C-alpha cells in the first residue's frame, strides 16, 4: 500500500463551532482519530492528512495524537481534486495503490478498507469506489453502472429522473492506482459551476479511457451493507446520531458478552472500556477512557467513571469516579466524588456527599457521609464521620468526628507543624 490520503481541510461551517469539525468527538475520540485509525489498518508507506481550515488546531492535535503522520496544506479550498493534489505534492513517485478517505467519516473501519483494496487488486481496477445502497439517496452522488463496471458518477443536482431513482450512492472513498491518480489529477479542470477541481472527474477519466495504465481495467465498485461506514458528519444533529449509533453497537456487544444493562439508550460506554461478566449497569451511566469494571460489580444509576478501575462486587451509586481504584466489595455513594489518586481498598465504604482526592482508604475503613479526605492515608478499620475535613494520616482504631471550627486538633491540621 503506497499511501493513504485523509482529507481534513474543509471548513465545517455547519457545525457553527470555533473548534475544527474534525476534532469534535464520537465516543470520546476526535473524528479525525477514528479516520487515522482506519487508515493505519492498511499499513501504508505514507499516511498524509490534508489540512486547511483551522489547520493550527488540527496540526496541534496530530502532533500529540499521531506524530508520525505527514501533513499537507490546502491553503484554499478548491475542491476534493485539489485537496488530493496537495496531498500528493510532498510524496515521491508512488507505486501501488493510493486510498483517499475523509476525516469526518468516523465509522469507516480498517477492515472495510482492507477488503476494498483486496477487491481492487483482484479485479485489477484503475479505480475502486466504495458504495452503499440507501433508502433515501437524496443529496448523494449516484453510481452509474454498465454491468459490473462503473461508467460514471452523477451528482444529485445534475441527475435526471432515471438517475435519481438509483439508490447506489458514492461514498467519496476510493482506491486509485497511484500512476492513474497522478495523471488524472494533473488533467483536472475547474470549468464548472463551483469553480472547483473534482476528484470524481478523475473517476470519469478512468471510466472513459482518458486515463489509462497498461494491464489495468477501468472503474469498479465495492459495495458494503453497513451504510453507517459511508456517512460523514456535517452538523451537530449528525454528530449526535453518529454518537448514538456507535454507542448502540458498543452497548449491544457488551450485553451479548454477559453484561446486564438496564437501559441501553441511557448508558454510554466508550470503546476502550473493559467489562467483566455479570456487571450490572443502571440508567445514566457514563463509562469513559480506559475504565475497567470487575465481575459482579454494580454501577449506577447516574454514575460517571473515567479512566478508573472498579473491582469485583463493588457498588457505585450516583457518584463520579476519576483516575481512581475502587476495590473489591467497596460501596460508594450516593453523591460522592472519588477524585484522581484515590485508592479504596476491599470492603471500604464511602457514603453520601463524600469527596476524596489522592487518598488511600484501607480495608473496611468507612467514611459514611459528608466529609472531605484529601492527600491522606486512612488505614484499615478507621471511621471518618460527618463534617470531617482530613488531609493527613488517620490510623485505626481512630474515629474522626464533628470537626466544626478552626480549633481542630493538630493531628488533623496540615499547617500545624509549618
Curated annotation (Swiss-Prot):
CDD domains: GT2_GlmU_N_bac. Keywords: Acyltransferase, Cell shape, Cell wall biogenesis/degradation, Cytoplasm, Magnesium, Metal-binding, Multifunctional enzyme, Nucleotidyltransferase, Peptidoglycan synthesis, Repeat, Transferase. Residues 258-418 are annotated as: N-acetyltransferase. GO terms for cellular component: cytoplasm; membrane. UDP-N-acetyl-alpha-D-glucosamine binds at residues 7-10, 21, 74, 79-80, 102-104, 141, 155, 170, 234, 339, 357, 372. Residues 237-257 are annotated as: Linker. It is found in: Cytoplasm. Residues 1-236 are annotated as: Pyrophosphorylase. GO terms for biological process: cell morphogenesis; cell wall organization; lipid A biosynthetic process; peptidoglycan biosynthetic process; regulation of cell shape; UDP-N-acetylglucosamine biosynthetic process. Acetyl-CoA binds at residue 386. It comes from the Bacteria. Mg(2+) binds at residues 104, 234. Coiled coil: none annotated. Pathway: Nucleotide-sugar biosynthesis; UDP-N-acetyl-alpha-D-glucosamine biosynthesis; N-acetyl-alpha-D-glucosamine 1-phosphate from alpha-D-glucosamine 6-phosphate (route II): step 2/2; Nucleotide-sugar biosynthesis; UDP-N-acetyl-alpha-D-glucosamine biosynthesis; UDP-N-acetyl-alpha-D-glucosamine from N-acetyl-alpha-D-glucosamine 1-phosphate: step 1/1; Bacterial outer membrane biogenesis; LPS lipid A biosynthesis. InterPro entries: Bifunctional_GlmU (IPR005882), GlmU-like (IPR050065), MobA-like_NTP_Trfase (IPR025877), Nucleotide-diphossugar_trans (IPR029044), Trimer_LpxA-like_sf (IPR011004). It catalyses: alpha-D-glucosamine 1-phosphate + acetyl-CoA = N-acetyl-alpha-D-glucosamine 1-phosphate + CoA + H(+); N-acetyl-alpha-D-glucosamine 1-phosphate + UTP + H(+) = UDP-N-acetyl-alpha-D-glucosamine + diphosphate. Binds 1 Mg(2+) ion per subunit. Its cofactor is Mg(2+). The active site is at 369 (proton acceptor). Its EC number is 2.7.7.23, 2.3.1.157. One of its GO terms (molecular function) is UDP-N-acetylglucosamine diphosphorylase activity. Catalyzes the last two sequential reactions in the de novo biosynthetic pathway for UDP-N-acetylglucosamine (UDP-GlcNAc). The C-terminal domain catalyzes the transfer of acetyl group from acetyl coenzyme A to glucosamine-1-phosphate (GlcN-1-P) to produce N-acetylglucosamine-1-phosphate (GlcNAc-1-P), which is converted into UDP-GlcNAc by the transfer of uridine 5-monophosphate (from uridine 5-triphosphate), a reaction catalyzed by the N-terminal domain. Homotrimer. In the N-terminal section; belongs to the N-acetylglucosamine-1-phosphate uridyltransferase family. This is Bifunctional protein GlmU. It comes from Cutibacterium acnes (strain DSM 16379 / KPA171202). The gene is glmU.
Amino acid at each position: 500500500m503506497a499511501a493513504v490520503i485523509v482529507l481534513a481541510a474543509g471548513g465545517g461551517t455547519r457545525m457553527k463551532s470555533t473548534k475544527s469539525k474534525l476534532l469534535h468527538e464520537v465516543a470520546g475520540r476526535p473524528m479525525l482519530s477514528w479516520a487515522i485509525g482506519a487508515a493505519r489498518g492498511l499499513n501504508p508507506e505514507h499516511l498524509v492528512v490534508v489540512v486547511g481550515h483551522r489547520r493550527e488546531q488540527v496540526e496541534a492535535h496530530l502532533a500529540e495524537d499521531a506524530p508520525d503522520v505527514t501533513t499537507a496544506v490546502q491553503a484554499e479550498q478548491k475542491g476534493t481534486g485539489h485537496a488530493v493534489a496537495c496531498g500528493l505534492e510532498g510524496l515521491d513517485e508512488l507505486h501501488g495503490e493510493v486510498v483517499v478517505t475523509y476525516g469526518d467519516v468516523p465509522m469507516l473501519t480498517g477492515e472495510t478498507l482492507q477488503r476494498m483494496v483486496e477487491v481492487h487488486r483482484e479485479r485489477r481496477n484503475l479505480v475502486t469506489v466504495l458504495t452503499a445502497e440507501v433508502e433515501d439517496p437524496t443529496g448523494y452522488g449516484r453510481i452509474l453502472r454498465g454491468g459490473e463496471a462503473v461508467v460514471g458518477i452523477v451528482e444529485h443536482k445534475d441527475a435526471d429522473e432515471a438517475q435519481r431513482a438509483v439508490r447506489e450512492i458514492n461514498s467519496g472513498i476510493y482506491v486509485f492506482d497511484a500512476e492513474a491518480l497522478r495523471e488524472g489529477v494533473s488533467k483536472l479542470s475547474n470549468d464548472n459551476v463551483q469553480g472547483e477541481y473534482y476528484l470524481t472527474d478523475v473517476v470519469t477519466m478512468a471510466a472513459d479511457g482518458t486515463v489509462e495504465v497498461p494491464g489495468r481495467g477501468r472503474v469498479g465498485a465495492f459495495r458494503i451493507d453497513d451504510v453507517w461506514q459511508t456517512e460523514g458528519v456535517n452538523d451537530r444533529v449528525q454528530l449526535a446520531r453518529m454518537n448514538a449509533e456507535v454507542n448502540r453497537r458498543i452497548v449491544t456487544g457488551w450485553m451479548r458478552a454477559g453484561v446486564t444493562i438496564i437501559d441501553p439508550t441511557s448508558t454510554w460506554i466508550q470503546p476502550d472500556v473493559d467489562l467483566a461478566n455479570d456487571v450490572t449497569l443502571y440508567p445514566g451511566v457514563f463509562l469513559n477512557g480506559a475504565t475497567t469494571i470487575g465481575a459482579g460489580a454494580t454501577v449506577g444509576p447516574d454514575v460517571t467513571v473515567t479512566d478508573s478501575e472498579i473491582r469485583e462486587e463493588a457498588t457505585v451509586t450516583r457518584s463520579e469516579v476519576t483516575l481512581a481504584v475502587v476495590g473489591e466489595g467497596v460501596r460508594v455513594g450516593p453523591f460522592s466524588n472519588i477524585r484522581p489518586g484515590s485508592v479504596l481498598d476491599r470492603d471500604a465504604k464511602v457514603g453520601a456527599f463524600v469527596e476524596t482526592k489522592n487518598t488511600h482508604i484501607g480495608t473496611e475503613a468507612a467514611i459514611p457521609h459528608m466529609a472531605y479526605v484529601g492527600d491522606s492515608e486512612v488505614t484499615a478499620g478507621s471511621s471518618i464521620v460527618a463534617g470531617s475535613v482530613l488531609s493527613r494520616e488517620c490510623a485505626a482504631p481512630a474515629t474522626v468526628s464533628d470537626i466544626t471550627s478552626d480549633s481542630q486538633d493538630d493531628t488533623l491540621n496540615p499547617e500545624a507543624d509549618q
